[in-house]
């Protein structure tokens, strides 16, 4: 049965899920297929953190951080995060950048500025946004909300493969333990806990290929009467 969700002139598809569920890859491929803009919300926080370090802005200088976030020139493409036109995908994964991201995100005005930047990615012809609270907090009016799930074992295997391909060593048992601990933290946190929106489509990717997951998202989008 076709959905009665109203058409939005600038449609948004949200793809949320836990770490290593495949949401980033699926989101990028769906966006590429539709010719939509792409938002990697997790990378956005790290990009802001990296920029604050490069421009010498202290983690406690709230006003300067807010202005920096407002002025950032950021672009996302499949597997690539660009800051001021330069690919910094590897730079933002550094532990120091992650620590800085956590340090600046404790400030309410900084979080508000980051939320505003995320919503500003909504531009014609449309947006695919991936993260943890895209469908519940950032884009509650999205035309399609997808929540990807996968077993912890499947996600640990994927993450291990990703790290090995990038030349990093990793112990799969340690990765599995870390994923389970992070799942517990994300699901139980007070602010924007990791959970599907009430109207989200659930997609278990444990036994699906990337192409199969992308095809399912596109099928759901077409079923809404949207061109795909």
Swiss-Prot record:
It is found in: Cytoplasm. Its EC number is 2.7.4.25. GO terms for molecular function: ATP binding; CMP kinase activity; dCMP kinase activity. ATP binds at residues 17-25. One of its GO terms (biological process) is pyrimidine nucleotide metabolic process. InterPro entries: Cytidylate_kin (IPR003136), Cytidylate_kinase_dom (IPR011994), P-loop_NTPase (IPR027417). Gene3D superfamilies: P-loop containing nucleotide triphosphate hydrolases (3.40.50.300). Keywords: ATP-binding, Cytoplasm, Kinase, Nucleotide-binding, Transferase. The keyword Cytoplasm applies. Its main location: cytoplasm. It comes from the Bacteria. Belongs to the cytidylate kinase family. Type 1 subfamily. This is Cytidylate kinase. It comes from Burkholderia cenocepacia (strain ATCC BAA-245 / DSM 16553 / LMG 16656 / NCTC 13227 / J2315 / CF5610). The lineage of its organism: Bacteria, Pseudomonadati, Pseudomonadota, Betaproteobacteria, Burkholderiales.
């Amino acid at each position: 049965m076709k959905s009665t969700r109203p058409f939005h002139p600038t449609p948004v598809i949200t793809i949320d899920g836990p770490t290593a569920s495949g949401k980033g890859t699926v989101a990028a491929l769906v966006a590429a297929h539709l010719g939509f803009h792409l938002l990697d919300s997790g990378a956005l926080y790290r990009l802001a953190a990296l920029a604050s370090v490069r421009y010498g802005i202290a983690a406690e200088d709230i006003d300067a951080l807010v202005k920096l976030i407002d002025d950032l020139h950021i672009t996302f493409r499949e597997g690539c995060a660009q800051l001021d036109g330069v690919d910094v995908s590897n730079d933002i994964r550094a532990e120091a950048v992650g620590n800085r991201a956590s340090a600046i995100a404790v400030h309410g005005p900084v979080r508000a500025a980051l939320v505003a930047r995320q919503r500003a990615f909504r531009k014609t012809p449309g947006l695919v946004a991936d993260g943890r609270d895209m469908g519940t907090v950032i884009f509650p009016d999205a035309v399609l909300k997808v929540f990807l799930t996968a077993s912890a074992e499947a996600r640990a295997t994927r993450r291990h493969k990703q790290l090995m391909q990038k030349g990093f060593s990793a112990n799969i048992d340690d990765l599995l333990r870390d994923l389970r601990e992070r799942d517990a933290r994300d699901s139980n946190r007070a602010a924007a806990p990791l959970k599907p929106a009430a109207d989200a489509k659930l997609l278990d990717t444990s036994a699906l290929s990337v192409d199969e997951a992308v095809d399912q998202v596109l099928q759901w989008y077409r079923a809404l009467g949207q061109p795909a």
